[in-house]
Amino acid sequence: MSTLAKIEALLFVRGEDWIRVRQLAELLSLPPTGIQQSLEKLSQKYEKDLDSSLDLIETGGAYRLVTKPQFSEILKEYSKAPINQSLSRPALETLSIIAYKQPITRIEIDAIRGVNSSGALAKLQAFDLIREDGKKEVLGRPNLYVTTDYFLDYMGINHLEELPVIDELEIQAQESQLFGERIEEDENQ
């Protein structure tokens, strides 16, 4: 098995996370200069191969595999359809809360929504829209949830600051309306 193939496999399993030359060198027990040369060869291979949809990008000494820009439209369509059809209203509510209040715990999300959010959190993690990001320094050390880079890509933004600004009073009004809808639903059952 070639060094190039090993590096490619590691880049593939790393997914959207960046990997540094130093990390690859440690994993493969090779000198960083050899890893750097292999990465350059791999990058050239992807550039020349017109039948490959992959590309290798580098930022600040870290690398990751991505799809070539010419595939962006088809990938946007693919990524939109299943999530739009599969995310329930509770999952969308949970995602919105995390996007605006992150980092946030499940208990804090539950308090805002008024119901248990475990199922919604699991679905959002499966879609790679959110991830665990450490523990809150309180009794029980609950997980903290944040949105992912994929969430930003999916929303078509580069930074969370680009999310629409929501007035705190508007949020409270929406929460009150949502709470009222739940009471009506409970009374009708």
Swiss-Prot record:
Ranges that cross the membrane: none
Pfam families on file: SMC_ScpB (PF04079)
UniProt-annotated location(s): Cytoplasm
Assigned keywords, A-Z: Cell cycle, Cell division, Chromosome partition, Cytoplasm
Tagged with keyword Transmembrane: no
Subunit structure: Homodimer. Homodimerization may be required to stabilize the binding of ScpA to the Smc head domains. Component of a cohesin-like complex composed of ScpA, ScpB and the Smc homodimer, in which ScpA and ScpB bind to the head domain of Smc. The presence of the three proteins is required for the association of the complex with DNA.
Highest taxon, organism lineage: Bacteria
Main location, first listed in the record: cytoplasm
Protein name: Segregation and condensation protein B
Keyword Cytoplasm: yes
GO BP annotations, alphabetical order: cell division; chromosome separation; DNA replication
InterPro entries: ScpB_csome_segregation, WH-like_DNA-bd_sf, WH_DNA-bd_sf
One Gene Ontology CC term in the entry: cytoplasm
Described purpose of this protein according to its UniProt entry: Participates in chromosomal partition during cell division. May act via the formation of a condensin-like complex containing Smc and ScpA that pull DNA away from mid-cell into both cell halves.
Family: Belongs to the ScpB family.
